[in-house]
Amino acid sequence: MKSLQALFGGTFDPVHYGHLKPVETLANLIGLSRVIIMPNNVPPHRPQPEASSAQRKYMLELAIDDKPLFTLDERELQRNAPSYTAQTLKAWREEQGPEAPLAFIIGQDSLLNFPTWHDYDTILDNTHLIVCRRPGYPLEMTQAQHQQWLEQHLTHTPDDLHQLPAGKIYLAETPWLNISATLIRERLEKGESCDDLLPENVLNYINQQGLYR
């Protein structure tokens, strides 16, 4: 049996401990062998990132340099069109074959607006969803049909993620760090310290490049 691997997408503008630490804890909790970080080039749901694709890629390389759990996948950075998760996960499934257990990691805030994503209802055909719980967010979807969809696919057993190739949603109890890329950009713009919010080598690069000023 192939080991469970997961994809973790985002703009990472910049990457910070709020991205990395919960996923490292998650990997230990459920036995993830590999987490593939996939930065977006043109995110459909957000404004264009402030840092360039090359700068965000380099910051990620710095952040995961000493973390063998993580690898970097650049395919979405090489697209000039919006990156739709459903398309990316379909391509990943085709590469990995029908039996490999695959998962996509999202935050609880993303789960609540998941039905607005492009072709959201095809995503579980190709992967599991692992949701990092966040305090203060409700556990129910806003519409009954979407709540029914959640309950239909929900599992409380991490073993299901290893034994099945796709189709399950698992709510993981991961630590919540009150850190966001927006907060970091705002603090940098004001000249405030971000020493405890992101890796030192990433912060040094940001300062060298004069980013987010």
Swiss-Prot record:
GO biological process: NAD biosynthetic process
Gene Ontology molecular function terms on file: ATP binding; nicotinate-nucleotide adenylyltransferase activity
EC number(s) per entry: 2.7.7.18
InterPro entries with a match to the protein in the record: Cyt_trans-like, NadD/NMNAT, Rossmann-like_a/b/a_fold
Keyword Nucleotide-binding: yes
Pathway per the UniProt entry: Cofactor biosynthesis; NAD(+) biosynthesis; deamido-NAD(+) from nicotinate D-ribonucleotide: step 1/1
Keyword ATP-binding carried by entry: yes
Gene3D superfamilies: HUPs
Highest taxon in the source lineage: Bacteria
Catalyzed chemical reaction(s): nicotinate beta-D-ribonucleotide + ATP + H(+) = deamido-NAD(+) + diphosphate
Record Pfam families: CTP_transf_like
Keyword annotations from UniProtKB, A to Z: ATP-binding, NAD, Nucleotide-binding, Nucleotidyltransferase, Pyridine nucleotide biosynthesis, Transferase
Function, in words: Catalyzes the reversible adenylation of nicotinate mononucleotide (NaMN) to nicotinic acid adenine dinucleotide (NaAD).
HAMAP family xref list: NaMN_adenylyltr (MF_00244)
Record-stated family: Belongs to the NadD family.
Protein name: Probable nicotinate-nucleotide adenylyltransferase
Recorded name of the encoding gene: nadD
